[in-house]
Swiss-Prot record:
It comes from Rippkaea orientalis (strain PCC 8801 / RF-1) (Cyanothece sp. (strain PCC 8801)). This is Nucleoid-associated protein PCC8801_2554. GO terms for molecular function: DNA binding. Its main location: cytoplasm. Binds to DNA and alters its conformation. May be involved in regulation of gene expression, nucleoid organization and DNA protection.
């Protein structure tokens, strides 16, 4: 080892490490706040014709299903499809909302892979 090289962990590396820890703490605090925000959200999904409405949280937790009387007249198979379509719509919107919120949280932090 040549004089002055040390173990490659000079002041510059320590500063980088401190910055990385600070970013991690920012992300952790933001993630906790985002988790609470997502839990409080109510995202609606609908079937075609809005005969069935599903409400989910921002964490994809189902909250309620509302079925209009006209949907009941469609029969079991079609009603099942309407409920499935409304669930998929709510899920898609919920995951898109979560993805957007995560991008907002991590933007500007220059985190690799995010």
């Amino acid at each position: 080892m040549t004089k002055g090289q040390g173990f490659g962990f000079g002041l510059g590396k320590i500063k980088e490490l401190q910055e990385a820890f600070a970013k991690a703490q920012q992300v952790q605090a933001g993630a906790q706040q985002l988790q609470q925000e997502l839990e409080q959200m109510e995202i609606e999904g609908f079937s075609e014709g809005k005969l069935v409405k599903v409400i989910m949280s921002g964490n994809q937790e189902p909250r309620s299903v509302t079925i209009l009387p006209e949907a009941l007249e469609k029969g079991a198979d079609e009603l099942s499809q309407l409920v499935t379509d409304a669930m998929k719509d709510a899920y898609t919107q919920s995951t898109e909302t979560m993805r957007t919120k995560m991008e907002e949280l991590t933007s500007g932090l220059n985190l690799p892979g995010l």
